[in-house]
A protein has these predicted regions:
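A general structural detector for well-ordered alpha-helical segments in enzyme core domains, enriched
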Residues: 16-19, 47-54, 87-94, 118-129, ...
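Conserved, mostly hydrophobic/aromatic
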Residues: 20, 66, 84, 95, ...
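Active-site beta-loop-alpha junctions enriched in small/polar residues
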Residues: 6-10, 31-35, 67-70, 108-110, ...
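N-terminal pre-domain/capping segments
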Residues: 1-67, 71-92, 277-287
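Active-site acidic/histidine proton-transfer and metal-coordination neighborhood
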Residues: 73-171
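Histidine-acidic metal/acid-base catalytic patches
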Residues: 158-287
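Alpha-helix N-cap and loop-to-helix initiation/capping positions
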Residues: 39-47, 75-87, 113-124, 148-156, ...
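Acidic (Asp/Glu)-rich catalytic clusters
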Residues: 18-25, 43-64, 91-99, 127-134, ...
Length: 287
């Protein structure tokens, strides 16, 4: 597992590598543009080359891009779907340029209609974005289970992948907090193992490409997407120890998206706390 954190690209893409290194990250996650604006940040071949050179010289082994929050691939609004497609395609092309492990996407939301039409619209946008980019994987994130959000269980994610063509570039991102507030008890090895078995059966672990590591500030099954710092939430140290040491997660980028002690995102202590829990968990599993 490559433990890391979400970091800023302020001042240029390559700066994210330095920030990740300062935090002790083995992987990083970035936004390819402001997450709350449609206007894309323009990068060119020189930016991509600088990023790759910085990464080659750093302890950071993997980078994941998170698509902007404004995207709703399932929207009935044609213009919103057009903007969503353009933004998602832009993210995938940047992923192509920097060699990203994937672009993480919140698939979208259904509003005031049956699930079927929303799923079909989302799948169409996803397929179009993949067609208009080269090789970067697109990773559908399991959402927190709130009614109306697509990807709120493994069945939905599997169906969405099938509707979008089941291509090899389509993958999965699991978030510890989202799973917990969905109602999946992932706080001990036995229960987590059953959840991973279900993910394998319904989606396939060959599609699991990255993880988000967050404690939960809301109770099990609450469907409330509220992240807490490592070991400070409802999952606690024991729960995250189990998640971080799951053998089938080995080798995956694992990004912290925690608030951090100063509410400015994860800091070095948060990253080190996650690494320590992983070591403790691996030791327990060997006993």
């Amino acid at each position: 597992m490559l433990v890391g954190a979400h970091v800023s690209t302020a001042g240029g893409l390559a700066n994210a590598i330095e920030r990740g290194g300062d935090l002790g990250c083995e992987s990083i996650q970035i936004f390819n543009q402001s997450p709350r604006m449609w206007r894309p940040t323009k990068y060119g071949p020189g930016d991509f080359a600088e990023f790759r050179m910085a990464m080659d010289a750093s302890p950071v082994e993997a980078v994941v891009i998170h698509a902007v929050y404004l995207i709703n691939c399932a929207s009935k609004d044609r213009e919103l779907r057009r903007k969503s497609l353009a933004s998602l395609t832009h993210a995938l092309r940047i992923g192509d340029g920097i060699g990203a492990s994937g672009v993480v996407l919140h698939p979208g939301a259904q509003k005031g209609e049956a699930l079927g039409p929303s799923m079909k619209r989302a799948a169409k946008v996803i397929a179009a974005a993949l067609d208009d980019s080269d090789r970067c994987p697109l990773l559908l994130e399991q959402t927190a289970g709130h009614k109306g959000l697509l990807g709120r269980d493994f069945d939905q994610t599997a169906e969405l992948i099938e509707l979008a063509g089941s291509g090899r570039r389509l993958g999965l991102c699991l978030d510890s907090c989202h799973l917990f507030v969905q109602g999946y008890d992932v706080t001990d090895e036995e229960h987590l193992g059953k959840v991973v078995d279900e993910a394998d059966e319904k989606v396939g672990l060959d599609r699991l490409r990255c993880l988000h590591v967050n404690d939960a500030a809301a109770p099990l099954g609450s469907c409330r997407d509220r992240h807490a710092n490592i070991g400070k939430g409802e999952m606690g140290r024991a729960g995250l120890r189990a998640f971080l040491s799951e053998p089938r997660f080995d080798g995956l980028p694992a990004t912290l998206e925690t608030p951090g002690p100063s509410r400015k995102g994860p800091d070095r202590k948060e990253v080190q706390a996650a690494k320590r829990l992983r070591r403790e968990g691996l030791e327990r599993r060997r006993q």
